[in-house]
């Protein structure tokens, strides 16, 4: 539909009716191209969220500007209760052309992509997101796991922290029986191994759970705490022992319907490619890191309590991580995916790209 304008040959008008019809069709196509294309871009982020203002909106503007106004992204935020599964269906059916997904259960629907949600090492969302993009690319996950959708970028968020309503977690013994909310079942095995009682609920439902004291706290990234507007509901924040792997990682992905991409002229496809990939994933990760830093500063300004679990808890933390990883390896093996090899390769990429680690 969006073809290049056609320069007509001087003798073309002397042809018959068929030629006239073809020329009319080219003229219509050329007119559509001249006016550009508008793609619908959906996500479940609040319009004033850090991710919206620091990445989603600027990214859409860059595509518009670099295409000289020929590609516009109409941002239509979904209800914040919309799940990743619902948004995935939206882009598959092309109700929207581009979507940003926060994945609740990547291990179930996207098992290879979900390896990066395991309790592996990491330091920054910026480096980890660059590693995740590379992982997605070299494993051809757009085709293999995202049903041939075009993966534009991927993000591994900052490390989760225990955010507690009242009392800080000073040692792992404090977690015994504690009801800890998590946004993904991927962390359930790990938390159980620490002695806690995990409560798997959507991120948006955590507000009510914390406000109504139905959970004692949440294991969530700082950026997630800010995005879900939970900061005023918790008073104490406890980090993993020094040298410990992350408890898990929240994963997100930016997807485009392939028919929408194919509808573009070649030069406009290049614009989309220019704003896809490793650097864009790192851009997302950097904005996540900055959001996390700002959230920690606000907590300090409120006078919240900060603790780091002691070195004596490191072995138990690592043991819980190993149990969670081994369980996933068994699941991957059952799918014929060579789990141990995948874990080894994922670790190598994180070490390569998360250079601060």
Question: Across the structure, where does each feature detected by a protein language model lie?
Answer:
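Short linear motifs centered on Gly/Pro in flexible linkers and helix caps
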Residues: 5-7, 26-27, 285
């Amino acid at each position: 539909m969006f073809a290049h304008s056609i320069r007509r040959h001087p003798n073309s008008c002397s042809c018959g009716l068929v030629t006239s019809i073809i020329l009319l069709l080219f003229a219509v196509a050329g007119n559509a191209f001249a006016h550009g294309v508008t793609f619908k871009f959906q996500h479940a982020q609040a319009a004033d969220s850090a991710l919206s203002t620091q990445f989603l909106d600027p990214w859409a503007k860059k595509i518009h500007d670099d295409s000289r106004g020929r590609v516009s992204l109409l941002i239509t935020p979904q209800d914040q209760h919309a799940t990743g599964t619902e948004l995935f269906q939206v882009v598959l059916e092309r109700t929207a052309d581009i979507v940003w997904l926060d994945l609740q259960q990547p291990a179930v629907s996207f098992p290879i992509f979900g390896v990066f949600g395991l309790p592996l090492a990491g330091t920054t969302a910026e480096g980890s997101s660059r590693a995740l993009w590379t992982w997605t690319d070299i494993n051809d996950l757009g085709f293999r796991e995202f049903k041939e959708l075009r993966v534009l970028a991927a993000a591994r968020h900052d490390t989760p922290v225990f955010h507690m309503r009242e009392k800080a977690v000073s040692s792992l013994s404090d977690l015994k029986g504690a009801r800890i909310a998590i946004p993904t079942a991927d962390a359930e095995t790990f938390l159980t191994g620490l002695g806690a009682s995990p409560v798997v609920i959507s991120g948006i439902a955590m507000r009510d759970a914390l406000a109504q004291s139905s959970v004692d706290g949440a294991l969530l990234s700082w950026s997630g705490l800010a995005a879900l507007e939970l900061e005023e509901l918790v008073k104490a924040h406890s980090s993993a022992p020094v040298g410990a792997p992350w408890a898990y990682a929240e994963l997100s992905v930016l997807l485009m319907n392939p028919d929408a991409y194919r509808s573009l002229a070649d030069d406009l496809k290049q614009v989309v490619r220019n704003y896809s990939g490793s650097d864009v994933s790192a851009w997302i990760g950097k904005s996540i890191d900055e959001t996390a830093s700002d959230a920690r500063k606000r907590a300090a300004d409120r006078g919240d309590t900060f603790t780091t679990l002691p070195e004596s808890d490191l072995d138990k933390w690592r043991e819980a991580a190993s149990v969670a990883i081994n369980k996933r390896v068994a699941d991957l093996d059952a799918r014929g995916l060579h789990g141990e090899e995948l874990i080894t390769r994922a670790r190598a990429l994180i070490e390569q790209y998360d250079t601060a680690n």
